[in-house]
Amino acid sequence: MRTLKLGGSTLDVPVIAVGCMRLDSLDRQDAERFVHTALDEGANFFEHADIYGGGRCEEIFADAAGMSSSVRGKMILQSKCGIRPGMFDFSREHILASVDGSLKRLKTDYLDVLLLHRPDALVEPEEVAAAFDELEQSGKVRHFGVSNQHPRQIDLLKKYVRQPLVANQLQLSITNANMITSGFNVNMENSAAINRDGGILDYCRLHDLTIQPWSPFQFGFFGGVFLGSDKFPELNTKIAEVAQKYGVSDTTVVMAWLLRHPARMQPVTGTMNTGRLKDCCKASEVHLTREEWYAILLSAGNVLP
């Protein structure tokens, strides 16, 4: 498994992050098999959130991993906080309480990475800064980042927060690629030219934030998986063609498409199927050509100006 430096930090992480949002759909035996398959593949970066399964996913993960100090040393744990029923909450009290809850459920005394999950309209950045300081000084969190945030929101936090922000988790896939396509539609009058995220892709590259694409196989906002979908026949044909060339699965090609981007992204898997997880990890070994990358992008209905 190839690795990258997370943001501007010295933390080496695998290029594939293992998402644990659906871990509560597995029984104990399957959860154990899933976690240990990931570790065997070199995908030791596990991605959580306090709300996944109402907290159960973190508990299931710790039990499945057989969490101990020696096991903990073999993995990198990231969790997110800031979502409550009916609201978002970046208050100092909520951030601190959320981290304590995650640590208890994960049976560990520290998180390698903490992300703020979704932008809080009532954010008081001074409170975020105070929470981050306490978490860093206590050793409970080693690195910090954000999720689903645009450049101005990040700049507001950076004005007050002392710690470097190392990651931004964003929805991105072949069929949800406005973050990419708006860049080459500059100065055009078509809908693809609409900048919906403040230029977050280039911002993250300029400011050393690793982009972690979530839902890399989805179209729309959890609209469904595009692989095998009759909504994307041309895309599926092209992906299958490239997969055959490299002797890999369609799943591998989808992840390789994201890894081909020079922003050095870290896609987050969502599957609970060990076979598909292995296919995702194989993308680390596949380097698409420029021609293949663009052909896949265009086959999804994206158009060059």
Regions found by a protein language model. Give the residues of each.
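Structural motif corresponding to the early beta-alpha repeats
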Residues: 71-93, 117-118
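Conserved beta-strand positions
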Residues: 18, 48, 79, 113-116, ...
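A structural motif
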Residues: 43, 108-111, 141, 165
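Acidic-and-aromatic substrate-binding clefts and catalytic sites of carbohydrate-active enzymes
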Residues: 23-29, 49-59, 84-89, 120-124, ...
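Beta/alpha (TIM)-barrel catalytic core signal, keyed to glycine-rich beta->alpha loops juxtaposed to Asp/Glu
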Residues: 125-305
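Active-site groove signature of glycoside hydrolases
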Residues: 103-124
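Short, acidic/polar
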Residues: 26-38, 90-105, 152-155
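N-terminal binding-site loop/beta-alpha segment at the start of enzyme catalytic domains
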Residues: 1-75, 137, 219-220
